[in-house]
Amino acid sequence: MPKTIYVLNGPNLNLLGTREPDVYGHATLADVERLCAETASGYGLAVDCRQSNHEGDLIDFIHDARATGAIGIVINPGGYTHTSIALHDALAAVQIPAVEVHVSNIHARESFRQHSFTAKAAFASLCGFGIDGYRLAISGLAAKLGITAKA
C-alpha cells in the first residue's frame, strides 16, 4: 500500500473554475485533485484529497492525517489562512511535514490577505503558481522526505 499525502482545501475552493476566474483561473477542484494524484503516483505515493468550508472539519482532517499515518500534508486553507490560529495549532500538533499552497499570489492582493497564520506551521509556502503550486508542493514534500520520482 503506497504512503499517503493528504491534500486539504478550505473554504470556497469547491468553487474553483467559476469563482473569480481572473484571480484563480479556470481549473476546477477536480482538476487539482487529478493533478495531485498524477504527481504523487510519479513518486509511488497516494493522495487523500479533502475539501471543506468549515474550519473544524479541516482540523479533523489534519488529525486524521496523523491517525492514518500520512507522511505529508498539502493545505490550501483558503480564507482561514489569514484568520485561523486553530489550523496553525493543528498543523503544529500533528508534526507531519506540511506545505501551504495558494493558487493566487496572496502577497500581491489586499493587505488583509498578506498575512498567513498557517504558513508558520508549514516547512514551505507556495503562492501564485496557479494549480501548478500543488504539483510543486507534492514534489517538494517528496524531496524533503527523500523520496525520488519513479522511472
Curated annotation (Swiss-Prot):
Lyase recorded as keyword: yes
Descriptive protein name = 3-dehydroquinate dehydratase
Residues at which substrate binds: N76, H82, D89, V103, S104, R113
Q: What broad taxonomic lineage does this protein's source fall under?
A: Bacteria, Pseudomonadati, Pseudomonadota, Alphaproteobacteria, Hyphomicrobiales
Recorded catalytic reaction(s): these are: 3-dehydroquinate = 3-dehydroshikimate + H2O
Q: Which keywords fit this entry according to its UniProt record?
A: Amino-acid biosynthesis, Aromatic amino acid biosynthesis, Lyase
What binding partners and quaternary form does the record give?
Answer: Homododecamer.
Annotated HAMAP family: AroQ
Role this protein plays: Catalyzes a trans-dehydration via an enolate intermediate.
Catalytic residues per the record? Answer: Y24 (proton acceptor), H102 (proton donor)
The pathway that the record names for this protein is:
Metabolic intermediate biosynthesis; chorismate biosynthesis; chorismate from D-erythrose 4-phosphate and phosphoenolpyruvate: step 3/7
Q: Which organism is it from?
A: Rhodopseudomonas palustris (strain BisA53)
Protein family according to the UniProt entry: Belongs to the type-II 3-dehydroquinase family.
InterPro entries assigned to the protein according to its UniProt record, in alphabetical order:
DHquinase_II, DHquinase_II_CS, DHquinase_II_sf
Q: Which CDD domains match?
A: DHQase_II
Instruction: Give the top-level enzyme category.
Output: lyase
Name of the encoding gene:
aroQ
